[in-house]
From Swiss-Prot:
<dbReference type="Pfam" id="PF00043">
    <property type="entry name" value="GST_C"/>
</dbReference>
<protein>
    <recommendedName>
        <fullName>Glutathione S-transferase hmp2</fullName>
        <ecNumber>2.5.1.18</ecNumber>
    </recommendedName>
</protein>
<dbReference type="Pfam" id="PF02798">
    <property type="entry name" value="GST_N"/>
</dbReference>
<feature type="domain" description="GST N-terminal">
    <location>
        <begin position="1"/>
        <end position="80"/>
    </location>
</feature>
<dbReference type="InterPro" id="IPR040079">
    <property type="entry name" value="Glutathione_S-Trfase"/>
</dbReference>
<dbReference type="GO" id="GO:0005737">
    <property type="term" value="C:cytoplasm"/>
</dbReference>
<comment type="pathway">
    <text>Secondary metabolite biosynthesis.</text>
</comment>
<comment type="function">
    <text>Glutathione S-transferase; part of the gene cluster that mediates the biosynthesis of hypothemycin, a resorcylic acid lactone (RAL) that irreversibly inhibits a subset of protein kinases with a conserved cysteine in the ATP binding site such as human ERK2. The first step is performed by both PKSs hmp3 and hmp8 and leads to the production of 7',8'-dehydrozearalenol (DHZ). The highly reducing PKS hpm8 synthesizes the reduced hexaketide (7S,11S,2E,8E)-7,11-dihydroxy-dodeca-2,8-dienoate, which is transferred downstream to the non-reducing PKS hpm3.</text>
</comment>
<dbReference type="GO" id="GO:0006749">
    <property type="term" value="P:glutathione metabolic process"/>
</dbReference>
<dbReference type="InterPro" id="IPR036249">
    <property type="entry name" value="Thioredoxin-like_sf"/>
</dbReference>
<feature type="binding site">
    <location>
        <begin position="51"/>
        <end position="52"/>
    </location>
    <ligand>
        <name>glutathione</name>
    </ligand>
</feature>
<dbReference type="InterPro" id="IPR004046">
    <property type="entry name" value="GST_C"/>
</dbReference>
<feature type="domain" description="GST C-terminal">
    <location>
        <begin position="88"/>
        <end position="212"/>
    </location>
</feature>
<dbReference type="GO" id="GO:0043295">
    <property type="term" value="F:glutathione binding"/>
</dbReference>
<keyword id="KW-0808">Transferase</keyword>
<dbReference type="InterPro" id="IPR010987">
    <property type="entry name" value="Glutathione-S-Trfase_C-like"/>
</dbReference>
<dbReference type="InterPro" id="IPR004045">
    <property type="entry name" value="Glutathione_S-Trfase_N"/>
</dbReference>
Length: 212
């Protein structure tokens, strides 16, 4: 059976790019958040928290985008190798460390900026908290400062081969570039080279076109 991916817009982009890198056939099923599809009883049977995306792999149901990507990378040998072998302890340790940094430091800062500067305005939730914005901008800059040192020595964040750690950054970092933070990327030449390369990958171009 073909893998089914439930979601809407950019919520599915992280999983889509992983499916495309792994060269896996899939069916993309729209969940229209604007119409409240995520709160319907049928969908809540798949994702009890009412969030997107959800993966159905021949009856095996998973949610949370990063967990889905890890599952796909571990299960399927096709396409790009995106996760190290668990018996390569140092490589796997670097991989898990990179995943944790992306989620705890980078995504946390990026999502705070998105909430304060975009979502609040869109949903009519008042003015942005500029104290939170300033702290998130400082945190974002710190991550790129450290990344630039790493990327001066290697092509990707965990070595010279691409991994999920790199792909995990694509949705939030692309949004930051689009919403006025291009200068932060350009401030760090190794980061800018790395991320420009990620955005130019055919799989990401296809994923973003499909996720719109």
């Amino acid at each position: 059976m073909v893998i089914k991916l439930y979601g809407s817009a950019m919520s599915t982009a992280r999983v889509l790019v992983t499916l495309l890198e792994k060269e896996l056939p899939y069916e993309h099923i729209l969940v229209d958040i604007s119409k409240g599809d995520q709160n319907k009883e049928e969908y809540l049977k798949l994702q009890p928290f009412g969030k997107v995306p959800v993966l159905d792999d021949n009856g095996f149901i998973m949610y949370e985008s990063r967990a889905i990507c890890r599952y796909l990378a571990r299960k399927y040998d096709s396409g790009t190798k995106l996760i190290p072998d668990v018996d390569d302890h140092e490589a796997y340790g670097r991989f898990e460390q990179g995943c944790s940094i992306e989620y705890s430091y980078f995504a946390a800062a990026a999502e705070t900026l998105g909430t304060e500067l975009v979502i609040k305005k869109y949903k009519g939730l008042g003015e942005p908290d500029m104290t939170r914005v300033a702290q998130a901008e400082a945190d974002f800059d710190k991550v790129f400062f450290e990344y630039d040192k790493i990327l001066a020595k290697q092509k990707y964040l965990t070595g010279d081969e691409i991994s999920l750690v790199d792909l995990f950054h694509l949705p939030n970092a692309s949004a930051l570039k689009a919403f006025g933070y291009q200068g932060t990327f350009e401030k760090y030449p190794n980061v800018n080279r790395w991320f420009s390369g990620l955005q130019a990958r055919e799989t990401w171009i296809k994923a973003t076109a499909e996720a719109r």
